[in-house]
Amino acid sequence: MIDKLIIIGASGHGKVVADIARKMNKWQSIAFLDDDESIKISMGLEVIGKTADAFTYKDEADFFVAIGNNAIREKVQEMLIEEGLNVVSLVHPSAVIGTDVEVGIGTAVMAGVVINISTRIGKGCIINTSSSLDHDNVLEDYVHVSPGASLAGTVRVRKGSWLGIGSVVSNNVNICSGCKVGAGAVVVKDITEPGTYVGVPVRKID
């Protein structure tokens, strides 16, 4: 049985992830890898090397990629998966997870999150603090739902999109890949073109 977790990324997001891992009480030891050589300890946990050193620990640890940038997180996680490393999901004990919910590998579900029945969440997603996903949502791989965001029922968010803090998505709305939705924005109809969207209701600004 593997009792060690290695978290790639020791900055802010990594610290939150480490706190979740501790509260899950699944691993006896937790350590970080980070390419910033100036970081030696984070959350009282040792930084034991750089990202490339993950392969040294392939057979003795589970892995989690705690990088906030969606594209970089995808690149690193897919590299680990391709090389056969065991990437896990992390779910805070305070999260409320409904029946028939799927959470993909490498996804973090933070404190206070509510995920309702029959929702599907892909690989490498961030479901951030106190966000809510209602019934029958589909979040594709490497999506980030920021703190306090609210998704109504039957919402679909395509790969790699990011919903800003406090954003709201109405029911039955589809958001295409490559979108950034700004803080406090309200999405009331489908977004079909990649870009940055802000406002109430949202408008495209680039």
What is the role of each PLM region?
Residues 18-20, 75-79, 121-122, 192-193:
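Short amphipathic alpha-helical segments
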Residues 89-205:
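Structural signal for interior beta-strand "rungs" in well-ordered beta-sheet cores
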Residues 3-21:
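Glycine-rich adenosine-cofactor-binding loop
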Residues 24-41:
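NAD(P)-binding Rossmann-fold cofactor-contacting core
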Residues 4, 28-30, 62, 86-87:
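Residues at the starts of beta-strands that form the adenosine-phosphate
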Residues 13, 72, 187:
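Short phosphate-engaging motifs
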Residues 38-96:
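Phosphate-bearing ligand-interacting subdomains
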